[in-house]
């Protein structure tokens, strides 16, 4: 039914007889001639019907867009004045000798020549995927997974499947629950990750494991999140954190080179503390040259409580972003930026425009100038490397609030002012995260997950001072996206019980939820570490789209619904009865 793909034809095929199968992309009737653009998954080629093959020409008059057809014909060179440099096949065309119509098409509910709403695209996803750009996204995804499998196989990793129906464990998000018909009143959980199973595989002696695996999280969705997503999941025994990072960095380096021909170079490493202080984010976008600078020590004794109060607080921060040549930012824009940081809890946004850096206070324009002395403003200029023509934005609040607000402002300024180098790739590793953080109720929670090992802490030291512990964890960040994260795991049962205890999981709950893990840790568990990459997010970056749904064949909406199949749907009453479940709505 096919000898070649449409999009694969080129000058080397001139003179060859070919059989093509695909769809009518466009049709043009020029009187005595009919041209169509014929499309398959590999691309588009122009097909010409001319009077030499009258039967095919007559049949072609009935063709319409999206008819599914077969063409038999000869590849010829296009005349020089008809070469289309915008098409991969633009130097050739196919003269059709025979035409078969596999199937006709109704008028499409989507218009491929216009921008359709995302709702329309998701409802008719099978048609949306016919678009060349969508087909290219899925081909890139397949290329990525093929490369990953090759790399992992070459480096001695075993592809081992782990269960989909498993036990609910606290991993930071709600589980999708599956009721058991056999064990009435009991539920399986769909895995948020294969975390515990891959650790158990290390205990079983499979020292290099990987899996490209579906995971599930019932959480509030964002543009780059889905309720079901795919991980490249990795675990190793007898490897240190730097060794794990090295082998995974080589994989990602090769992936970029193989997929888009980009050399990412050596990945720099930065601590979580440095990333937060300099960039206001634990996944900094290093394409943006703006940085956050602390000035609390300079302003702690000025007569301006907005600055001096957080500057003198152990939990406060006063920070500055210098925008080079930002003096022309208008008051209206400043007001908009003030509203913007308010989204992150900031109470305001102070600013200083520098007209003449050599004139001290006389050379600045600012509503806070009256609270500053010549010495203070000079110290701030020196700290921020300010120049005439710059503007300084100040954030002052609790440390986390000021950091989050200034980090978000940094990104917005970079986008708005064209400072972020969108044509660059800036990868890095972020390491040494806090072991614990406070949740909304003020309780300690694991920043990564409760199986992450602390750095250089005994169980006794961790119990005594948990908030000072640093996790032996690491995230890979590319252009402001966390593409992968992992850690060295706890392999000592006493340390694991200590972490559970700090998290408020008592001994009875430990046995109920994690008894199998605690038992396994007693039998000669090796030191082990791992990492997981988000395949969807990697593909999103490598295809250049900003919407993760563009790289998943059949994604869900932000409301976790499938518009095409109308899932989720009401369950059959008899099925619910067999499961001993009653719905209350």
Swiss-Prot record:
Amino-acid positions noted as binding ATP in the UniProt annotation, renumbered to this chain: 217-219, 226, 482, 534-537
Protein's UniProt keywords contain Oxidoreductase: no
SUPFAM superfamilies reported for this sequence: Class II aaRS and biotin synthetases, GAD domain-like, Nucleic acid-binding proteins
UniProt keyword list: Aminoacyl-tRNA synthetase, ATP-binding, Cytoplasm, Ligase, Nucleotide-binding, Protein biosynthesis
One GO cellular component, as annotated: cytoplasm
Broad class of enzyme this protein falls into: ligase
Region named Aspartate: 195-198
Subcellular location: Cytoplasm
Chain sites annotated for binding L-aspartate: 171, 217, 448, 489
PROSITE patterns recorded: AA_TRNA_LIGASE_II
Pfam families: GAD, tRNA-synt_2, tRNA_anti-codon
Origin: domain of life: Bacteria
EC number: 6.1.1.12
InterPro entries in the record: Aa-tRNA-synt_II, aa-tRNA-synth_II, aa-tRNA-synth_II/BPL/LPL, Asp-tRNA-ligase_1, Asp-tRNA-ligase_1_N, Asp/Asn-tRNA-synth_IIb, AspRS_core, GAD-like_sf
Family note: Belongs to the class-II aminoacyl-tRNA synthetase family. Type 1 subfamily.
Assembly behavior: Homodimer.
Function: Catalyzes the attachment of L-aspartate to tRNA(Asp) in a two-step reaction: L-aspartate is first activated by ATP to form Asp-AMP and then transferred to the acceptor end of tRNA(Asp).
Protein name, per record: Aspartate--tRNA ligase
Organism whose genome encodes this protein: Histophilus somni (strain 129Pt)
Lineage: Bacteria, Pseudomonadati, Pseudomonadota, Gammaproteobacteria, Pasteurellales
């Amino acid at each position: 039914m096919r000898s070649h793909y449409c999009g694969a034809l080129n000058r080397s095929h001139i003179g060859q007889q070919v059989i093509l199968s695909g769809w009518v992309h466009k049709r043009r009737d020029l009187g005595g001639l009919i041209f169509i653009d014929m499309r398959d998954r590999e691309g588009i080629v122009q097909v010409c019907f001319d009077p030499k093959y009258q039967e095919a020409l007559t049949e072609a008059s009935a063709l319409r867009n999206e008819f599914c057809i077969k063409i038999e014909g000869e590849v010829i060179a296009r005349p020089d004045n008809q070469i289309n440099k915008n098409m991969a096949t633009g130097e050739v065309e196919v003269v059709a000798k025979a035409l078969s119509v596999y199937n006709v098409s109704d008028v499409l509910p989507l218009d491929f020549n216009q921008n359709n709403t995302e709702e329309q695209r998701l409802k008719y996803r099978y048609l949306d995927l016919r678009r060349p750009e969508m087909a290219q996204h899925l081909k890139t995804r397949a290329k990525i997974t093929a490369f990953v499998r090759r790399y992992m196989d070459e480096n001695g990793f075993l592809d081992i499947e782990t269960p989909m129906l498993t036990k609910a464990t606290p991993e930071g998000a709600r589980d999708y629950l599956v009721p058991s018909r056999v064990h009435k009143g009991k539920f399986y959980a769909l895995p948020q990750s294969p975390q515990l199973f891959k650790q158990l595989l290390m205990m079983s002696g499979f020292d290099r494991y990987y899996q490209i695996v579906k995971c599930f999280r019932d959480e509030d969705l964002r543009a780059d999140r889905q309720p079901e997503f795919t991980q490249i999941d990795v675990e190793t025994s007898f490897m240190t954190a730097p060794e794990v990072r090295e082998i995974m960095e080589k994989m990602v380096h090769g992936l970029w080179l193989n997929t888009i021909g980009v050399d990412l170079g050596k990945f720099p490493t930065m601590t979580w503390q440095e990333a937060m202080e300099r960039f206001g984010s634990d996944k900094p976008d290093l394409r943006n040259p703006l940085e956050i600078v602390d000035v609390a020590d300079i302003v702690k004794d000025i007569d301006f409580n907005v600055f001096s109060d957080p500057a003198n607080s152990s939990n406060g921060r006063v920070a500055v972003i210098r925008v080079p040549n930002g003096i022309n930012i208008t008051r209206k824009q400043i007001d908009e930026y003030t509203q913007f940081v308010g989204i992150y809890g900031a109470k305001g946004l102070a600013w200083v425009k520098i007209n003449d850096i050599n004139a001290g206070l006389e050379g600045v324009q600012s509503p806070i100038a009256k609270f500053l002395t010549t010495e203070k403003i000079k110290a701030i200029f020196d700290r921020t490397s300010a120049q005439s023509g710059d503007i300084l934005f100040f954030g002052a609040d609790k440390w986390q609030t000021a950091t989050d607000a200034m980090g978000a402002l940094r990104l917005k300024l970079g986008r708005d002012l064209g400072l972020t180098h969108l044509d660059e790739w800036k990868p890095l590793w972020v390491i040494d995260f806090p072991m614990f953080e406070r949740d909304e109720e003020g309780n300690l929670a694991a920043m990564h997950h409760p199986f992450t090992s602390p750095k250089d802490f005994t169980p006794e030291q961790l119990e005594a001072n948990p908030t000072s512990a640093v996790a032996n964890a690491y995230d890979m960040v590319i252009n402001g996206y966390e593409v992968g994260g992992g850690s060295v795991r706890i392999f000592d049962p006493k340390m694991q019980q200590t972490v559970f205890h700090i998290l408020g999981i008592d001994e009875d709950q430990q046995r109920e939820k994690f008894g199998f893990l605690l038992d396994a840790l007693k039998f000669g568990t090796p030191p082990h570490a791992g990492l997981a990459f988000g395949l969807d997010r990697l593909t999103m970056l490598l295809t250049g789209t900003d919407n993760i749904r563009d790289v998943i064949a059949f994604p869900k909406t932000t409301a976790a619904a499938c518009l095409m199949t109308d899932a989720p749907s009401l369950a059959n009453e008899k099925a619910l009865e067999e499961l001993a479940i009653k719905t209350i709505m």
